């Protein structure tokens, strides 16, 4: 359907693939089916709905998560904590409670307010960020989710001072983005824990000062304490593997902070022994604590200055290679798989 008030129709240029798409497909996030997935999209504006003045036909744009814009969190500048976040992004409907997609008379659910695995998408203006036309549009979509999640966790929430130490478990898109952000701070010690030598080598090029193979993770806590002189200031788990979350908490020093960014299964923590006894913090961060309309342009500025080379994470696939793209993501043959739609 055409865009309604406050909405924009965009012809999709490309979309990143993300583990969250699979989580929704597998119904770990109960998005109503059938649905069109995809939530790291970018493209060119085709039409604008009533009341939309900030975008026009031909604009280059990328998408981020949806938010209502009128709850207490949104009004306080925290759209990542929108009180209607789950309904807007995972409820299968647009912000007005209706659907824009259908096939043979059957309504189809949307995802993350964008459903970017498609030729066209209708998106609320809240989720759209305009970008300069001199940028390579195709690579920008992942900024709207995975990249801002990792980078934002560091730059928006942790805000490490120069000389701090940070450990990142997982060298996928989120982890690599956190490493690049930590390098910007700059942290003294940036320790990457990853699954294969190729990704660890890239992590080193992007700013990691030390690397550790995940298969050798049993002794990682001791190694980190040796490198950092007693424990890291911060540790981020991007894998969602419960054992790595526990190791992230164990490797930070007294009053240190461990962060969970991945979808994590059941986990048992001994509060006195592992958390309270040393004044540690264990926190979850959603979408990098980001206000996308402000933070994504900041990341693009860093990229243009050569300080945030996120393009090195990307491997491009054609849309009909979508299954291969997900397989490459699983195997580590692609850090950020990107589907080209044009």
Regions found by a protein language model. Name each.
Residues 162-171, 183-247:
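Adenosine-nucleotide cofactor-binding segment
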Residues 256-257, 280:
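Glycine-centered, small-residue-biased loops immediately flanking beta-strands
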Residues 175-176:
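N-terminal Rossmann-fold NAD(P) dinucleotide-binding loop
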């Amino acid at each position: 359907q055409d865009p309604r008030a406050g909405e924009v129709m965009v012809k999709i240029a490309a979309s990143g693939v993300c583990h969250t798409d699979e989580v929704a497909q597998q119904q770990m996030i109960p998005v109503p089916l059938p649905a069109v997935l995809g939530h790291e999209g970018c493209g060119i504006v085709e039409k604008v709905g009533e009341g939309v003045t900030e975008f026009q036909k031909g604009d280059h744009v990328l998408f981020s998560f949806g938010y209502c814009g009128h709850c207490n969190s949104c009004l306080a500048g925290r759209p990542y904590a929108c009180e209607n976040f789950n309904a807007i992004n995972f409820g299968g409907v647009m912000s007005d409670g209706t659907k824009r997609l259908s096939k043979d008379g059957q309504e189809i659910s949307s995802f993350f307010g964008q459903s970017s695995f498609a030729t066209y998408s209708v998106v609320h203006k809240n989720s759209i960020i305009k970008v300069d036309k001199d940028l390579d549009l195709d690579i920008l979509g992942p900024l709207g989710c995975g990249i801002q999640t990792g980078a934002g966790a560091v730059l928006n929430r942790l805000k490490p001072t120069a000389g701090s130490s940070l450990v990142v478990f997982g060298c996928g898109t989120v982890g690599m983005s956190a490493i690049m952000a930590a390098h910007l701070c700059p942290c003294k010690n940036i320790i990457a824990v990853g699954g294969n030598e190729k990704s660890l080598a890239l992590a080193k090029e992007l700013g990691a000062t030390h690397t550790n193979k995940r298969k050798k993770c049993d002794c990682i806590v001791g190694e980190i304490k040796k490198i950092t002189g007693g424990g890291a200031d911060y540790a981020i788990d991007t894998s969602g593997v419960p054992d790595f979350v526990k190791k992230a908490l164990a490797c930070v020093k007294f009053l240190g902070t461990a962060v969970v960014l991945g979808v994590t299964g059941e986990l048992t923590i001994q509060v006195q022994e592992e958390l309270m006894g040393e004044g540690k913090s264990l926190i979850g961060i959603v979408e990098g604590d980001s206000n996308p309309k402000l933070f994504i342009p900041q990341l693009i500025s860093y990229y243009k200055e050569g300080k945030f080379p996120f393009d090195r994470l990307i491997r491009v696939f054609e849309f009909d290679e979508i299954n291969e793209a997900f397989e490459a993501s699983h195997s580590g043959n692609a850090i950020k798989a990107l589907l080209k739609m044009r």
